[in-house]
Amino acid sequence: MNGLIKHKLELLPSNPGCYLHKDKFGNIIYVGKAKNLKNRVRSYFRGSHDTKTELLVSEIADFEFIVTESNIEALLLEINLIQENMPKFNIRLKDGKSYPFIKITKELYPRLLITRQVKKDGGLYFGPYPDSGAANEIKKLLDRIFPFKKCKNPANKVCFYYHIGQCNAHTICHTTEDYWQGLVEDVKNFLNGHDDKIVNQLKAKMKDMSDQMAFERAAEYRDLIEAVSTLRTKQRVIRQDMQDRDIFGYYVDKGWMCVQVFFVRQGKLIQRDVNMFPYYNDAEEDFLTYMGQFYLDSRHLKPKEIFIPGDIDQESVEALVGDEVKVFKPKRGEKKQLVNLATKNARVSLTQKFDLLEKDIAKTQGAIENLGKLMGIPTPVRIESFDNSNIMGTSPVSAMVVFENGKPNKKEYRKYKIKTVEGPDDYASMREVIRRRYSRVKRDGLTPPDLIIMDGGQGQVNVAKDVLRNELNLSIPVAGLQKNDKHQTNELLFGDPLRVIDLPRQSEEFFLLHRIQDEVHRFAITFHRQVRSKNSFSSKLDGVEGLGPKRKQKLLKNFKSMTAIQQASVEDIQALGIPKKVAQALLDKLSQDSH
């Protein structure tokens, strides 16, 4: 805890309000609310926390707070601050998404659309549907049944949909405003669950076509009837009152929250939505924050009713959704069972997440244990892997990645610029890097890896063994990963003498080695590109008197490219602390080089 934070903690009031945690760059990284600012903010800097909260606290360099009149006011302010600043540690709706709706436009000739924007434009909106697939499925069925206008053709022209019976060309078919209004009412009834009239009409048309021996058209109507029936089956009726409502349940475990929402429209459960995220405050307060992020977004259509769990403050939810929505905390009966069902589903979803995570960990752990057995060595908990990268010997580099318990530990990655080798000599380059890496391990008493994997065959393995055994007197197992002619991981070499370790291509052990080889190759190539770009940049600045390495570095850091420098003014370059004479000489040289 720095001195600034310590001083500010002493000044915190006991009022309700919002607090904004900032990092060392002044960026807002977390927004929270509290009934008592003093107790809540101080809690971050006292006692122990779980891993995710410790990560948050480790990045806090400063904080601000805003006092409010009430906890509800703090809740509303928190939502607005989160939406405005999008702090990285705050919960967000998945992919920042809004939900799709089916819309009937308010036009002379109405159209059916799918939209994620709910506007006050006179259109009719039905939904929400938690994904575009569900909305598209229903719209396709509507398109087949109701011949709405689908094109932007002039009134005196017909379109493709007219020829397949899915669009009434309004002028040619002499349709009236009453006709279109009737069509709108039919769709409203259909989407509101009153589809018996439509089914009866389809059955009558099917019989009529059959009587006329038009069996293909009759089959089309039969398929439409079956499609409506299938849709009915998917939309489970959970209430007979035909009301629109959202039913919420949530569950917390291991510092994570899962919120489950049942979307009920016209008494039918049309879809559900699941969101999982880490929480940092009280579970009830973060649940309210989640609801606020959803319902304060103007793109989201509110239902007539909302059911919430019994431990959630009803007054706060009512403040979030407004007077037009009724909020209930059911205590018994069928409504209570629906909230319990949403809560149960939230628990199942979160439990499944942890089960899958544990299975993944167990699978990876099993892979490294089996790898050790196949190689005849102790389980390689820590694996260090090396790869070289250069183009015809220019800008040669090497890179090391570290996998611990089968997972990459990027904090332990290392980059090496080759210092003692000239020209394209991979073996000499690797000899230098192995020497530098493990001399430091030995000198500083660092924990050596359980296994070293070279991105290469026998030559690379032998070089590493020679340095470790004969120069450093270290006994660390070294293996090599050879690639085939398609540059794909092919086989593992290990032993003394080297032999191919038999690994099935579909085994977890092979997949682990494949990931390691891909990662070290990616890391080495990325580093090489950075060095090559920097060297190219620096070489173009050579020959300017007064422009040494430090000033070149400043130019690279601030302008990023030669083009940006060429477009800069003398004053822009002077602002970096470079004398006017040197700045002018630099721009003159770049101007000459470009001609």
UniProtKB/Swiss-Prot annotation:
Keywords noted in UniProt: Cytoplasm, DNA damage, DNA excision, DNA repair, Excision nuclease, SOS response
Could you name the Gene Ontology cellular component terms for this entry?
cytoplasm; excinuclease repair complex
Q: What is its main location?
A: cytoplasm
Q: Does the keyword Cytoplasm apply?
A: yes
Known role: The UvrABC repair system catalyzes the recognition and processing of DNA lesions. UvrC both incises the 5' and 3' sides of the lesion. The N-terminal half is responsible for the 3' incision and the C-terminal half is responsible for the 5' incision.
Stored PANTHER family? UVRABC SYSTEM PROTEIN C (PTHR30562:SF1), UVRC/OXIDOREDUCTASE (PTHR30562)
* Protein family according to the UniProt entry: Belongs to the UvrC family.
Name of the protein described by the UniProt record: UvrABC system protein C
This protein's gene is called: uvrC
